[in-house]
Amino acid sequence: MEIEKNNRINSLLEFYEQLLTPKQKEYITLYYADDYSLGEISEEFQVSRQAVYDNIKRTVNILEKYEQQLHLLSNFEVRNAKFDQIRAYINQKYPEDTELKHFLDDLEKSEEE
């Protein structure tokens, strides 16, 4: 469960980090992406552990709120699942069609940009 939560927060951060303040971005990145403890973050920024905890908790809530309103992560996951289905279909039905595979690769790359 904890790994899934970390992965989700890191994914949300990729989509919404530009909407966070610099301090929110730093705390949540250190905690979830870089695996710092609350104590390590509090020492680095010379604030209490409670202040760090409150900031991180508030930031997670903000990220979840953005996702509820904008659905960027969930839409991305749906599109990726569709790409996987299309790729499997192409590999099964048209295994020799390199041009079709190339088109799908290009479409997938444009999605990532």
UniProtKB/Swiss-Prot annotation:
Entry-linked InterPro entries: RNA_pol_sigma_r3/r4-like (IPR013324), UPF0122 (IPR007394), UPF0122_fam_protein (IPR054831), WH-like_DNA-bd_sf (IPR036388)
Cysteine disulfide links: none
Pfam family, one: UPF0122
Family: Belongs to the UPF0122 family.
Role according to the record: Might take part in the signal recognition particle (SRP) pathway. This is inferred from the conservation of its genetic proximity to ftsY/ffh. May be a regulatory protein.
HAMAP family given in the database record: UPF0122 (MF_00245)
PANTHER family for this protein: UPF0122 PROTEIN CBO2450/CLC_2298, UPF0122 PROTEIN YLXM
Protein name: UPF0122 protein PEPE_0845
Organismal lineage: Bacteria, Bacillati, Bacillota, Bacilli, Lactobacillales
